[in-house]
């Protein structure tokens, strides 16, 4: 998020963000305290531009939305936990394998931190259980950083996703007659 303003300006594109995270465009630490801002700037040798881009478009409200960017349809799912407005974007590619841009929600073998301002372990667990777990195994996951993976690989090996899946199964209605 720290590079959004310069990228949006350079490529003349809007910044898409969930309404719950809009404040982070100018305040990525989630705090308006001067000391936190100064620490962020010092850590990055004053290379951050902590400002909102000129063109900010809020993602449609609600848990699910569909948008089209450069001719590609995306299913957008609100997936709070790392931040209040975390979202994942699933590129729907027809006969090809779908791709999930997971941001800081899901990584290979891990998940986004929930101990930072705006994070919530409970919301992350719900997002993993209700948004990520039901996805098909073949979906390629491109996280905000780190190596790519697939939903199937994470379902088989990611302890956070496995725990969320077991909670989902425990809450499933008993269909036995």
List the predicted regions and their residue ranges.
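Metallo-beta-lactamase
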Residues: 6-9, 20-78, 83-177
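Solvent-exposed, well-ordered amphipathic alpha-helical segments
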Residues: 14, 66-68, 92
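Conserved beta-strand scaffold positions in the cores of enzyme catalytic domains, especially
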Residues: 15, 56-58, 132, 141
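Di-metal (Zn2+ and/or Mg2+/Mn2+) metal-binding site signature of metallo-dependent hydrolases
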Residues: 1-13, 82-89
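Generic beta-sheet signal
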Residues: 16-19, 144
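Short active-site-adjacent helix-start/loop capping segments
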Residues: 1-2, 24-26, 150-151
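Residues at secondary-structure transition points
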Residues: 2, 20, 118-119
């Amino acid at each position: 998020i720290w590079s959004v303003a310069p990228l949006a300006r350079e490529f003349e594109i809007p910044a898409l963000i969930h309404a719950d995270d809009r404040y982070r465009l100018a305040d990525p630490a989630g705090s308006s305290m001067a000391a936190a801002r100064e620490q962020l700037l010092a850590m990055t040798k004053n290379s951050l531009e902590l400002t909102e881009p000129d063109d900010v478009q809020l993602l449609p409200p609600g848990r699910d939305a569909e948008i089209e960017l450069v001719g590609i349809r995306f299913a957008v799912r609100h997936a709070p936990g790392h931040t209040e407005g975390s979202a994942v974007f699933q590129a729907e590619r027809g006969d090809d394998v779908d791709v999930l841009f997971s941001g800081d929600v899901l990584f290979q073998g891990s998940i986004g931190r929930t101990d930072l301002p705006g994070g919530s372990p409970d919301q992350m667990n719900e997002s993993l259980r209700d948004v990520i777990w039901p996805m098909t195994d073949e979906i390629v996951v491109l996280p905000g950083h780190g190596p790519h993976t697939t939903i199937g690989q994470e379902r088989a090996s990611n302890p956070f996703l496995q725990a969320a899946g077991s909670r989902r199964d425990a809450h499933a209605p008993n269909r036995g007659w």
